[in-house]
Amino acid sequence: VSSTQRRVEHGITIDADVETVFDLVADVARWPQFHLSAVHAETVHANEKGELVKYWALDGDAAVRTWQTVRRTDRPGRRITFAHMEARPPATELRGEWVFTELAPDRTRVELSHQVGAPADADLGPLPDGLAQDSEDCLTTLRDTAERHADLDELVVSFTDPLFIAGSVEDAYDYLYRADLWPERIPHVVGLAMTEDEPNVQFFDMDTKGPDGSTHTVRSVRICLPSRLIVYKQISLPAMLDAHTGHWRFTETPEGVVAEARHTSTIKRSALSQLGGATTVGEARRYLRRLLSGNSMSNLRLAKAYAEERAGF
């Protein structure tokens, strides 16, 4: 069967230095904080030929799609190439590249291209338009993030809190995996409606009670990698945040388990008045750290008590 190639190309000019822009694309672990649809990405393995990266992304507001690509990063050549391990039918091949050109010390041109291979008689349907829309969204987000990078250094709050658990990793993981039981297990969670239509992909709407007694509802998506990692991203956000992602990570040790809670939040500068008229970014950072750390450490201590009781301690 004869085949044909179709190329989809998009570009954007960004008022930021080429290294900043390149780094934002190269570091896939940071994508979920800035790209609306990105939920999680991790390197499966890497060698001198490149790295195999697995991605999870929102498909609407109630589903997640996942795919794997082989990426090769050429920093001196300012180029990142990628090839999908499996193309979405009827495509038989999907590959592409990012090319970064320095126009001036603080101005960069970025070109993102995709090449789609398919049988000559195949109807690609919405695939090219979907790639075009995804590319435009991705480039726009890249521009906005790169041009705000100095501001975001101040507005992004990121921290990790660990806790040792003298129990099994399976029990510690299970306690936090079973979010449907949180209203009866975790004091600040007053309601939670969860769906898990695909194993280990959870969507839930959670009602939490704040220190002042007020109730907030957020919608989140979670990717659960059994006994190892639970990654989450808030889809609907509190008024003072532009983004909130994080994870629960579980690491076995000879003595038990180290469980860690990670939060990365982007403060919305225009909403600082939510905390009081003259609130500074520094005060908002301290408030967020205290609130988020308090909640997640409380959850970890409950997971610890559950796992250690089941271990006979």
Spans of features found by a protein language model:
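Non-catalytic surface loops within mature trypsin-like serine protease
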Residues: 16, 75, 102, 116-118, ...
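A general structural signal for short secondary-structure boundary/capping elements
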Residues: 55-60, 115-120, 144-150, 154-163, ...
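A broad, low-specificity signal marking well-ordered, structured residues that form hydrophobic/aromatic
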Residues: 80, 98, 159, 163, ...
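Beta-strand/loop substructures that line and gate deep hydrophobic ligand-binding cavities in soluble
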Residues: 5-7, 55-60, 66-67, 83-140, ...
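Transmembrane beta-barrel architecture of outer membranes
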Residues: 158-160, 217, 245
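Hydrophobic ligand-binding cavity/cleft-lining segments
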Residues: 1-49, 136-198, 313
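Glycine-rich portal/gate segments that line the openings of hydrophobic small-molecule binding cavities
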Residues: 29-33, 42-95, 137, 180-184, ...
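Generic structural detector for well-ordered beta-strands
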Residues: 11-13, 72, 99, 162-164, ...
